[in-house]
From Swiss-Prot:
Subunit structure: F-type ATPases have 2 components, CF(1) - the catalytic core - and CF(0) - the membrane proton channel. CF(1) has five subunits: alpha(3), beta(3), gamma(1), delta(1), epsilon(1). CF(0) has three main subunits: a(1), b(2) and c(9-12). The alpha and beta chains form an alternating ring which encloses part of the gamma chain. CF(1) is attached to CF(0) by a central stalk formed by the gamma and epsilon chains, while a peripheral stalk is formed by the delta and b chains.
Source organism of the structure: Oleidesulfovibrio alaskensis (strain ATCC BAA-1058 / DSM 17464 / G20)
Protein name per its UniProtKB record: ATP synthase subunit beta
Homology family: Belongs to the ATPase alpha/beta chains family.
Stored PANTHER family: ATP SYNTHASE, ATP SYNTHASE SUBUNIT BETA, MITOCHONDRIAL
Chemical reaction(s) catalysed: ATP + H2O + 4 H(+)(in) = ADP + phosphate + 5 H(+)(out)
Gene that encodes the chain: atpD
Amino acid sequence: MSNIGKITQVIGAVVDVEFADGNLPNILNALVIKNPNNADCPELICEVAQHLGDNVVRTIAMDATEGLVRGMEVTDTGNPIMVPVGSASLGRIMNVVGRPVDEMGDIDAAKSLPIHRPAPEFNEQNTNVELLETGIKVVDLLIPFPKGGKMGLFGGAGVGKTVILMEMINNIAKQHGGISVFAGVGERTREGNDLYHEMKDAGVLEKAALVYGQMNEPPGARARVALTALACAEYFRDEENQDVLLFVDNIFRFTQAGSEVSALLGRMPSAVGYQPTLGTDLGGLQERITSTTKGSITSVQAVYVPADDLTDPAPATTFSHLDGTLVLSRQIAELGIYPAVDPLDSTSRILDPNVVGAEHYSVAREVQMVLQKYKDLQDIIAILGMDELSDEDKQTVARARRIQRFLSQPFHVAEVFTGTPGVYVKLEETIKAFRGILNGEYDHLAENDFYMVGGIEMAVERYNQRQQAA
């Protein structure tokens, strides 16, 4: 017999439900409310968050609560939110509760999984380290991606996090050919729509599952949609032994949704108004994103940085979970250098000669040294000008400016608004080109020859065209 309760109170996204004696649903159980007053959401799913006493549970709604009234019947499903997984989810867009939102009919999955699951045991985890090529020069050279690892793209508003993420989806999904899962967490619906059509045009959609809970969704959906995507990815890793790519845009919105709900649940706010359970919430998600002996989940996460402050509790808590951090800088974006990656602030755990090889490591470190020297000299240049520098410093500055421009790159996904065709650059070409710049082989080329090119041969070609024209 089903367990039925009644609504006693509705406050925004939080719904209180009273059950009979001894029939309280477990924490994290999904409850279903038939809501005939709301045509957009006739069946609302809520998740139990707290037991308040007096047989009342406090729940978080996964959709709009308009039309709910006190006394409505609520049914306990007896399980957490269950979402369809497996090949039926590929090429489709679903919401937080696993319902399709692409108007292409139901998702006929043979299996459903709960969105809340324990992280893999320590002895099931895989510790092999391997580099994953992205085709983006600055990333492959200075911030190499570990296969089966977690990378974060940190940046303030409008510095290009989503564009880099989309380029990685385009490059890695095409080259890697495996299965991708994309979680749109509290971002623009327009970007979700663009991504769907880009993946369709690129022919990678049939190998991707998309899970959206965008900006207009209630906080309950935004706080759980990343877990829905993770359940899809875990199925491919554990049951089908696949190497899966998990893209999350934006992990900050997951935290933000948690803080919106936290106050409604009556918890005391902690630093900067965030929920007191910030570390636990994020840890519960991040610990499940890992490689096991069966397969791997490689995750790329965009992290919004409020007011460009990396010490804000949300980005600061995220840092500790990641294998690599790709920090996007507004100063570099202002120079017109895209991707606006800060090569001195970004780090990767696998930039190690034992993993990437001695040549790659030495080129990467020398590039960083030249850029750091240029940064140190900038105050002197600003006050006294270039003429006051020694010949050696002048050469360092000239090479640093060439390196800085060569770290820019035209993207496939930005082709629509730049008009420049995107380029995928192989890792060995990247290392060879930067070694050449460091050794002075390209000192005769102008700085602008290096701007927005793919391989070094494109820069040389620009120089040759100029020489012929002259």
